[in-house]
Curated annotation (Swiss-Prot):
It comes from the Eukaryota. It comes from Neurospora crassa (strain ATCC 24698 / 74-OR23-1A / CBS 708.71 / DSM 1257 / FGSC 987). This is Woronin sorting complex protein. Residues 241-307 are annotated as: Disordered. Keywords: Membrane, Peroxisome, Transmembrane, Transmembrane helix. It is a multi-pass membrane protein. Residues 241-264 have a biased composition (Basic and acidic residues).
């Protein structure tokens, strides 16, 4: 940068700060001019001054590039949901990290499957009831959403979750859908009418899908967290044979091992010895005057406990 350009930039910044100090910058009162200038610069510039910069920019992207924006939103939320649920449930991978292999898979599902499908279905739903604002039309829209749109989305979701979980055959996928379908539908039927009624009342149609994704993020994180906790508890029961208190069982096993070692070790000064030290009974006594082999500090305890 040349000296002339440097002075020009400094002058522009000083002028912007002075403008903000007098409250001339839209949305500012002059109390914190430097913060106002910085905040305006990073939230869209002067043309967006006085508006909610990030939200305005996001809604603008929803209008100009709806599918791309929804794909990025759904992918980010799905990956974040898996990561947050893993952290809450203390579900780590073999390297001890919460960023498991499911995180990028869930992000891919959200961006490439969930978002395009939801975009298409919500578009059809909105087209069916376009320019129909009566209470009857709104109730009918909620019914169509719950009886047609939700079953399609939930079925695709369960198929994707089965594949991500490692299902290899169509029968395994069918079993996953059969077991989980009505459970997921019950959650949808409880939350969807409220969310759709809220969207009908307060949100522009372009913002419906991101709003539904945000609600699904919180509900999905909770369900994912509960599922992970149950799976970890089942693994502990299988591994330790003692419900969710596997760590305590591990401690009790070690304590019993130490007690067994103390009772099994021959006391010093008793039994056959050489030089006041107990002789390893498996080696017998030594009459040849050679060095005494080291004692066996930990006698055999049979099979190791299951850890």
């Amino acid at each position: 940068m040349s000296v002339k350009e440097h002075h020009s930039t400094v002058g522009a910044i000083a002028e912007a700060v002075a403008e903000a100090a007098h409250g001339d910058l839209p949305g500012t009162k002059g109390h914190h001019p430097i913060s106002a200038v910085i905040g305006t610069a990073i939230t869209g510039g002067r043309q967006n001054a006085g508006t909610k910069g990030y939200l305005t920019a996001y809604l603008k992207q929803l209008e100009t590039n709806p599918l791309r924006t929804k794909m990025l939103t759904a992918g980010t939320l799905a990956g974040s949901q898996e990561l947050l649920a893993s952290w809450l449930a203390k579900d780590r991978n073999k390297n001890g990290n919460y960023f498991t292999a499911r995180v990028p898979k869930m992000a891919t599902y959200g961006a490439l499957v969930s978002a395009p499908l939801g975009h298409f279905l919500i578009w059809i739903l909105q087209k069916m009831f376009q320019n129909r604002k009566s209470l009857r039309a709104k109730i009918l829209q909620i019914l169509v959403s719950n009886l047609i749109v939700a079953p399609i989305q939930n079925s695709v979701y369960l198929v994707a979750m089965a594949i991500i979980a490692g299902a290899k055959t169509w029968k395994q996928v069918q079993a996953t859908v059969r077991v989980g379908f009505w459970k997921v539908m019950k959650v949808s039927w409880l939350s969807s009418p409220l969310c759709l009624a809220f969207a009908q009342k307060f949100l522009p149609e372009a913002a419906w899908m991101p709003f539904f994704n945000l609600v699904s993020f919180f509900i999905g994180t909770y369900i994912n967290y509960i599922t992970k906790k149950k799976r970890l508890a089942a693994l502990r029961r299988k591994h330790f044979g003692d419900g969710a208190h596997g760590d305590h069982r591990h401690d009790r096993e070690r304590e019993r091992d130490r007690e067994r070692e103390r009772h099994s070790s021959p006391p010093h000064g008793h039994g056959p010895s050489h030089g006041g030290r107990p002789i390893n009974p498996t080696l017998g006594s030594h009459h040849g005057g050679g060095p005494v082999p080291p004692p066996q500090d930990y006698p055999s305890l049979g099979q190791n406990p299951r850890y």
